[in-house]
UniProtKB/Swiss-Prot annotation:
Enzyme class: ligase
Protein name: Glycine--tRNA ligase beta subunit
Compartment annotation: Cytoplasm
Main location: cytoplasm
Catalysed reaction, written as an equation: tRNA(Gly) + glycine + ATP = glycyl-tRNA(Gly) + AMP + diphosphate
Species, as recorded: Pseudomonas entomophila (strain L48)
GO molecular function list: arginine-tRNA ligase activity; ATP binding; glycine-tRNA ligase activity
Keywords: Aminoacyl-tRNA synthetase, ATP-binding, Cytoplasm, Ligase, Nucleotide-binding, Protein biosynthesis
Length: 684
């Protein structure tokens, strides 16, 4: 079957930059879906996305759809005809369903069968529908109309190129008749560009000052920005999302170095970086110590004969932005940070839970309570908690919401607060996402944990639990944040105690009955997914969860120990034995004695197991107390042989009641040893 290259390019007004790459990928995916359904093959694919165009190039696309045959079985022959050979309703209905006369149905087999040979269509006749369907299925939240057209798209369309080989595919899509004329750069090449063949597409546009390939533009911007930064003895801040957005804004990228007055460096650099990145799409430069340089890189969409004009234009545009940040910073510093709490008394956190100031007071008390348990200062944690929300009422955060916490840090330093108190005002929001940075100070960790626990307890306390994908207060993220801080920072905090303290802070604002247990269950349930992501089996998690440890750090240490235990050759047998023991003890009548009486032993294997348990108990108790869970389980693994021998030779449910009760007591001692670490019966 012969094949030819295929090109489709839809020209538009400037497409949304943040969505450009995803629109291109979706366009290609839709075309691939249509071609697959039509049974058409090709050797390679490429998507192109630039500010004013979406394009797909397929190499060696089949020019003819393959013929195909369909066979549809109908009712059995005996059900299709009556005794006289007349067709029944089943036969007539089958023929009608197939859209043919009964005489066209094959009646020679055990079942009626309709067979049809369908000749393949020319690919050129199928492509318009495939392309149109793909465009209609693009992930566009809001489509628009333009002019007198009734068509809808993300932006008004301007032209359409559709070529199969060197021939134009005759069609009209989104009010544009297909042709071979594309368009070049608005300024460098305002004339139309004739695309002779699909294979020449990229180079034809390159000659017209358009780099159609998104990845090529992105790499060029990244490389040239790094080179210019080195020339300025600095390094560029190039967030991937910003790089993608800038790439989507330009067809012919030309990075240029600009500057601003050094006086602006007195403003917190995070504010300057935020406004330059978010509002102007600039790449900021840092020196070797991570300090902001008074220079930045802009990416022009034109190769100017006088780049100085572009540089000066950008410098002129950014100056008011930086001046605003400077003004807000100076205004905020005119009053102590703590004074902003007065404004927060009128800002509602949650209607049933009070104001943001109320929350700050609760966080202050809870942080002061938590700090000593993790080795921190109660006084500093309490102070940081009280100041934790102050910057939310500042001019700086009002203009730049991303500065919450960061602004508080600078204002606290300006007021002479201790370094760890100032740092905690920013660290309270950590981690800001999965895998993000954790607090570095104990004061910051205490405030971060307190803030998250306060939110969890408060929102759970008024019954606003997260459901499905709805989690408006980010409670799942808060719970994971608490766990990450405690586990990864190796902080041994009893969450049961902390949550109960948090509940008391709310008084009658929440329904306290069962609230602590509900919040703790929610928090520790988050560990299940965390461990699954780490490749730890859910049974390992459940074996520890059954003991309900209050410390996340202790929980993790037990899980890691059980995971290591499961790799031992004795693990499976001991897990099965523990499961058997658990079942037996669960069926025991009456209370099980605490003491084992050797005088009731009548089998040597009972004595052997008892002796092994006694020795293991003496060795394991200190290990468990010191949380040396790996060592404890490794020592308990030695019980496999006496346990196996016991169950092979001893009938637990002996006829003699005292012997039976004593054997239950012996097994209870055995189970208790393992329960000092985890319920390994759940591993079986």
């Amino acid at each position: 079957m012969s094949a030819q290259d295929f090109l489709v390019e839809l020209g538009t007004e400037e497409l949304p930059p943040k969505a450009l790459a995803s629109l291109g990928d979706a366009f290609l995916a839709g075309i691939e879906k249509g071609l697959q359904a039509a049974g058409l093959n090709y050797t390679s694919k490429q998507v192109y996305a630039a500010p004013r165009r979406l394009a797909v190039l397929l190499r060696q696309l089949d020019v003819q759809q393959p013929d195909r045959s369909i066979n549809i079985d109908g009712p059995p022959r005996q059900a299709a005809f009556d005794a006289e050979g007349n067709p029944t309703q089943a036969a007539l209905g089958f023929a009608k369903k197939c859209g043919v006369e009964l005489s066209d149905i094959d009646q020679s087999g055990p079942k009626l069968r309709f067979s049809q040979h369908i000749p393949g269509k020319a690919t050129a006749s199928l492509l318009p529908t495939i392309v149109e369907d793909s465009l209609n299925d693009l992930p566009i939240p809001k489509r628009m109309h333009w002019g007198a057209s009734r068509e809808e798209f993300v932006r008004p369309t301007q032209w359409l190129v559709m070529l199969l080989g060197d021939q134009v595919v005759d069609c009209t899509i989104l009010a544009q008749k297909a042709g071979r004329e594309s368009r070049g750069h608005r300024f460098h090449h305002p004339e139309n560009v004739v695309i002779t063949t699909p294979a020449n597409y990229v180079e034809d546009l390159r000659k017209a000052y358009v780099l159609a390939d998104f990845a090529e533009r992105r790499e060029l911007i990244s490389k040239r920005t790094a080179e210019l930064a080195m020339q300025q003895e600095g390094s560029a801040i190039v967030p991937p999302a910003l790089l993608d957005e800038v790439t989507a804004l330009v067809e012919w990228p030309v990075p240029l170095v600009c500057s601003f007055e050094e006086r602006f460096l007195e403003v917190p650099q995070e504010a300057l970086i935020t406004t330059m990145q978010d509002n102007q799409k600039y790449f900021c430069l840092l020196d070797s110590e991570g300090k902001l340089l008074p220079r930045f890189i802009t990416v022009a969409n034109v190769e100017s004969r006088d780049p100085k004009q572009i540089v000066e234009g950008n410098e002129k545009v950014v100056r008011p932005r930086l001046t605003d940040a400077e003004f807000f910073f100076k205004q905020d510093k005119k009053q102590p940070l703590e004074s902003f709490n007065e404004r927060l008394k009128n800002v509602v956190f949650q209607a049933q839970l009070g104001t943001v100031f109320d929350k700050a007071e609760r966080v202050s008390k809870l942080a002061a309570f938590i700090a000593p348990y993790i080795g921190g200062s109660a006084a500093n944690a309490g102070r940081a908690g009280l100041l934790s929300k102050c910057d939310l009422a500042s001019e700086m955060v009002g203009e730049f919401p991303e500065m919450q916490g960061i602004a508080g840090y600078y204002y606290a330093l300006n007021d002479g607060e201790p370094q760890d108190v100032a740092l905690a005002l920013n660290e309270q929001y950590m981690p800001r996402g999965a895998g993000a940075e954790l607090p570095q100070t104990l004061t910051g960790a205490a405030v971060a944990i307190a803030d998250k626990l306060d939110t969890l307890v408060g929102i759970f306390g008024i019954g606003m639990l997260p459901t499905g994908s709805k989690d408006p207060y980010a409670l799942r993220r808060a719970a994971l944040g608490v766990l990450r801080i405690l586990i990864e920072k190796q902080l041994d905090l009893d969450l049961t105690t902390a949550v109960e303290f948090a509940v008391k802070q709310f008084g009658t604002k929440v329904k306290a009955a069962g609230l602590s247990e509900q919040v703790l269950e929610f928090i520790f349930d988050r560990l299940r997914a965390r461990y699954e992501d780490e490749g730890i089996d859910v049974a390992t998690y459940l074996s520890v969860r059954a003991l309900k440890p209050g410390s996340a750090l202790d929980f993790d240490q037990r899980v890691q120990a059980v995971q290591a235990f499961r790799k031992l050759p004795e693990a499976n047998a001991l897990a099965a034995a523990n499961k058997r023991v658990s079942n037996l003890l669960g069926k025991a009548e009456g209370a099980i004695a605490d003491q084992v009486e050797p005088k009731y032993f009548d089998n040597a294997n009972e004595f052997s197991l008892y002796s092994a348990i006694q020795q293991a108990d003496q060795a394991v108790q200190p290990m468990a107390s010191a949380r040396q869970y790996n060592e404890a389980l490794a020592r308990l693994a030695a019980l496999r042989d006496p346990v196996d021998a016991f169950f092979e030779a001893v009938l637990v449910n002996a006829e003699d009641a005292k012997v039976r009760a004593n054997r239950y007591a012996l097994l209870s001692r055995l189970r208790g040893l393992f329960l000092g670490v985890a319920d390994i019966s759940l591993l079986g």
